């Protein structure tokens, strides 16, 4: 799949945590070089499940609840650590699926916390 991406794509996306996408991006960069393409021409985006909590005490329980899926759980400060690690891994865009963030005002509040407290680590 990365061979096709390296030849034809403008953007590459995968569900991931920072270490996974960093390793896969390195593979993509090598595939680009093998195909004579500048790896910088391909934007990288990712997504994971997000659970915004008031405390990190239960974060591991949320991560285990969705075992096998990329997941970030905890306070906005803890989420910001992952956001910064994605940035350092070369990610250009993080997609935040909102179906794990509650409903109505709870969802809006969680998104606001991500935007205001965690997203600045990506800039």
State each model region's role.
Residues 1-123:
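Active-site-adjacent structural elements that line small-molecule/cofactor binding pockets in enzymes
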């Amino acid at each position: 799949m990365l061979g096709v991406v390296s030849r034809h794509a403008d953007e590459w996306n995968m569900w991931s945590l920072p270490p996974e996408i960093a390793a896969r991006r390195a593979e993509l960069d090598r595939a680009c070089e093998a195909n004579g393409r500048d790896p910088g021409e391909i934007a990288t985006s990712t997504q994971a499940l997000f659970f915004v909590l008031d405390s990190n005490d239960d974060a591991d329980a949320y991560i285990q609840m969705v075992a096998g899926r990329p997941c970030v759980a905890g306070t906005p400060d803890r989420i910001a650590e992952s956001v910064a690690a994605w940035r350092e891994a070369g990610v250009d865009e993080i997609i935040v699926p909102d179906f794990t963030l509650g409903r109505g005002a709870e969802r809006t509040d969680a998104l606001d916390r991500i935007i205001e407290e965690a997203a600045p680590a990506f800039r």
